[in-house]
Design a protein with these regions (language model features):
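Structured, basic alpha/beta domains of bacterial-type, RNA-associated proteins
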Residues: 2-24, 28-35, 39-137
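Short acidic DE-rich linear segments
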Residues: 137-143
Length: 143
């Protein structure tokens, strides 16, 4: 299941997004993540768009997923979102072998990463609805 994204809510004020199985070592992804940790979401996306690292792409996807969850599912204002947590942990390791001389095989591991993004921000103000006038019951309601 490489590059799957799992989304959930931690608390009322934080929204999480996971990107699991990113096919790159966590040490390399962590370097990119440290560039944008603690910044606003919009600033982070601009910085990552101009970062010449392969790891920037999955970090962008995870941040955009967290932003979309916060706006669409939880009613946050997109302009006020801040990355409160951006952590990179080790994912599953694939054990492989590379051929060597004299019929030998040398083992190595393909590393993967899990990215966790938590965003916080202000909720959108709820628009006041106009007072609804008393309406006459319809035929179905009067029965």
């Amino acid at each position: 299941m490489p590059n799957t994204t799992k989304n959930q809510v931690a608390a009322a004020d934080k929204v999480r997004s996971y990107a699991k199985g990113v096919d790159q070592a966590p040490r390399k992804v962590g370097l990119v993540a440290s560039l944008v940790r603690g910044r606003t979401v919009n600033d982070a996306l601009v910085i990552l768009a101009h970062t010449p690292k392969r790891a920037a792409k999955p970090v962008i996807k995870a941040i955009e997923s967290a932003r979309a969850n916060a706006i669409n599912n939880h009613g946050f204002d997109g302009k006020t979102l801040i990355i409160s947590t951006l952590s990179v942990t080790t994912g599953t390791r694939l054990k492989r072998f590379v051929p060597a001389s004299r019929g030998r095989a040398l083992p190595f591991q393909k590393k993967s990463s899990n990215i966790l993004v938590e965003v916080t921000g202000a909720l959108k103000p709820v628009k006041a609805t106009p007072a609804t006038a008393e309406k006459e019951p319809t035929k179905e309601e009067s029965k």
